[in-house]
Amino acid sequence: MKLSLIAQFLELPLPSIEKEIVGISSLEGATPDEISFVEQDRYASSLKESRAGAVLIRASLLSLVPQGCTPLVSAHPYLDMARLSKLFAKPPLGLNAQEPQIAPSAQIAPSATIGKGAVIGERTIVMAGAVIGEGVCLGEDCLIYPNVVIYRDTQIGNRVFIHAGSVIGSDGFGYAHTERGEHIKIHHNGIVVIEDDVELGANNCIDRAVFGETRIKRGTKIDNLVQIAHNCVLGEHSIVVSQVGLAGSTTTGRNVIFGGQSATSGHLHVGDFATIAARGGVSKSIEGKKTYAGFPLMEHKEWLKLQASLKHQLKKSQ
């Protein structure tokens, strides 16, 4: 799509340079034939290093645009990105015309649905009522329990177990808001990648990325009823206990443990070997190799001292 057509669609001033744009992506992931966006000056460093061919940007930030990147001046870059995402959204069905490739040793229940272009590896089992979407790749020795739904283009490694009722690759909860309070859907054009030896409990929801990937790295084990939002990256051999919620763009190192009902606020990083106790709330990036508890989050030993102090104060007041 011509950049000038994008400008016309968004009702923005025409660009100074014409170029062909094939997609929309983040500043970090964009290529010279993709467009990105900048809403705030705190992303200036990412913009300077971006390879994006064009960028939606406020007039006040034009001086930050690197050479080779064509600006489209917008009063509301994030909102215009949401509107633009619809133009580049893949259709939910019919994009792939190829017949699915199912390995001879795979077992597929008669009531399971396998979409066009899907690939099912050797010895993989897909049970009753499961839906494998178009373009999904399932590795070898996987076990997909009843009524699992795996949306299009999801990539799953070897020896992955997904228990009943889980949904992989649905759209994340992403909206931009107009001045009148309307909510404009951000179409999610990324994918989900689940690496080797991952096990997902029942009724998990793992959302596809807005751009790029949501990724669950190898060896990670996730309990029942867990929500992992768009663009999260969960490190190798991590443990996630029931009812955890990870907000969008949460990333973790390896061997991180999330206790039951703990949560993150998104756009933050949890370091290697960190442990979040049950109901802990992570609101900013934290170091690894420590145990944390409470909300506001603090080191577990400090939380224990606080609880003891509160108990002491209550006794004094009685």
From Swiss-Prot:
One of its GO terms (biological process) is lipid A biosynthetic process. It catalyses: a UDP-3-O-[(3R)-3-hydroxyacyl]-alpha-D-glucosamine + a (3R)-hydroxyacyl-[ACP] = a UDP-2-N,3-O-bis[(3R)-3-hydroxyacyl]-alpha-D-glucosamine + holo-[ACP] + H(+). Its EC number is 2.3.1.191. CDD domains: LbH_LpxD (cd03352). One of its GO terms (cellular component) is membrane. One of its GO terms (molecular function) is N-acyltransferase activity. The active site is at residue 230. It comes from the Bacteria. Keywords: Acyltransferase, Lipid A biosynthesis, Lipid biosynthesis, Lipid metabolism, Repeat, Transferase. Pathway: Bacterial outer membrane biogenesis; LPS lipid A biosynthesis. Belongs to the transferase hexapeptide repeat family. LpxD subfamily. Catalyzes the N-acylation of UDP-3-O-acylglucosamine using 3-hydroxyacyl-ACP as the acyl donor. Is involved in the biosynthesis of lipid A, a phosphorylated glycolipid that anchors the lipopolysaccharide to the outer membrane of the cell. Homotrimer. This is UDP-3-O-acylglucosamine N-acyltransferase.
